[in-house]
Design a protein with these regions (language model features):
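N-terminal Rossmann NAD(P)H-binding glycine-rich loop of SDR-like oxidoreductase domains
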Residues: 12-33
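NAD(P)H-binding glycine-rich loop region in Rossmannoid oxidoreductase-like domains
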Residues: 57-101, 105, 109, 126-127
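Conserved Rossmann-fold NAD(P)-dependent oxidoreductase catalytic core, especially the SDR/UDP-sugar
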Residues: 104-147, 167
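Active-site Tyr-X1-5-Lys
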Residues: 143-167
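Substrate-positioning beta->alpha
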Residues: 150, 179-185, 199-222, 228-232
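Glycine-rich Rossmann NAD(P)(H)-binding loop
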Residues: 176, 198-204, 231-238, 247-253, ...
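Conserved C-terminal active-site "lid" loop/helix of NAD(P)H-dependent oxidoreductases
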Residues: 210, 246, 269-300, 306, ...
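Mid/C-terminal beta-alpha module of Rossmann-like enzyme folds, strongest
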Residues: 219-278, 309-322
Length: 322
């Protein structure tokens, strides 16, 4: 294992996409850890302002962006702002402008300004689709399957070609407070009193705790040895669907209560209920190995079982409407 070497501490860190699901807790965590933060968001007024954080408005990334004012006095950048894979009405051209085009301008401005490091938050979708028969590592040939993934891969290539000092982090699906999508659906199912037809499914999927995503960003900012590298980032322990449901239900004091159902029948039921989108994420494997990042010295803050259980309890206790 290669021992991690601490780089000089960043000065002023620009975080783009700072009011989103990852951005807001990232900004708060970095501020608590003593980083000086300039937080850029399309809706800065919508975010609570931690002490010592400067909030600025992020221009529309689909248009021309002058990055120089945002980079004034900045030593490092964490670039989270991007088109999301589930945003309605997103075409190939918009993905290209918002994800790749904006990154090209940012990388050029960062290099011209002599920035210390640009940490690009990318996605595992730059490397693979929503399932994979083999364990995914950084050495797995990149084969994105949709415009979102292709735009992420092209943004990564543009950053490397720019010559700007950088680290690229490819996150898998993140869970944490306020999570939406498939994880939120599983949590709703876990709260129901009914047995669920999941016990036959043994495919495993990698997830990423929000706390672990934040610790990976801090690692990318602080460590000398990771400069110029690309990492896939996931909790080390992928889980099968019955295991996830058991963890979620145990967290609120319930038995797993799962039973077998033939896969074709479950697929049909999902389609009839209008949730065909759940079929692959729930029943097909996507195992992502963070071995390279672990070998560099990153240590996740918590394991998947602990993280999912804590999230389930927190969401259970959350007052309605918050």
């Amino acid at each position: 294992m290669t021992a991690a070497r601490a780089a000089p501490r960043p000065g002023l860190v620009l975080v783009t996409g700072a009011s989103g699901f990852v951005g807001r807790p990232l900004v708060a965590a970095l501020a608590r850890a003593g980083y000086v933060i300039r937080a850029a968001s399309r809706r800065p007024q919508a975010a609570a302002v931690p002490s010592g954080v400067e909030w600025v408005r992020l221009p529309d990334l689909a248009g021309e962006v002058d990055w120089r004012p945002l980079l004034a006095g900045v030593s490092d950048v964490v670039h989270l702002a991007s088109a999301t894979h589930d945003e309605p009405g997103m075409g190939v051209e918009v993905y290209d402008r918002v994800t790749r085009g904006a990154l090209v301008g940012l990388a050029e401005a960062a290099k011209a300004a002599g920035l210390r490091r640009l940490v690009l938050i990318s996605s595992i979708r730059a490397q693979t689709g929503i399932s994979s028969d083999a364990v995914v590592t950084e050495a797995t040939p990149a084969q994105p399957t949709d415009p979102y993934g292709r735009s992420k891969l092209e943004a990564e290539a543009a950053l490397r070609a720019s010559g700007a000092p950088h680290v690229i982090l490819r996150f898998v699906r993140i869970y944490g407070p306020g999570v939406k999508g498939h994880i939120a659906t599983l949590m709703r199912l876990a709260r129901s009193p009914w047995p669920l037809p999941f016990s036959s499914f043994r495919s495993r999927r990698s997830l990423l705790a929000l706390e672990n995503a934040i610790s990976a960003v801090r690692f990318a900012l602080d460590e000398t040895a990771v400069a110029g590298e690309t990492y896939v980032v996931a909790d080390p322990d992928p889980l099968a669907l019955p295991e996830i449901m058991a963890v979620l239900r145990a967290a609120i004091g319930r038995r797993p209560a799962v039973f077998p159902l033939p896969a074709p029948l479950l697929e049909t039921l999902l389609r009839l209920s209008g949730r065909a989108d759940l079929w692959q994420p729930l029943t097909q494997s996507l195992i992502v190995s963070p071995a390279k990042l672990l070998a560099a010295g990153w240590r996740p803050a918590l394991d998947t079982r602990t993280g999912l259980a804590a999230l389930m309890r927190a969401e259970q206790d959350r007052p309605a409407g918050t």
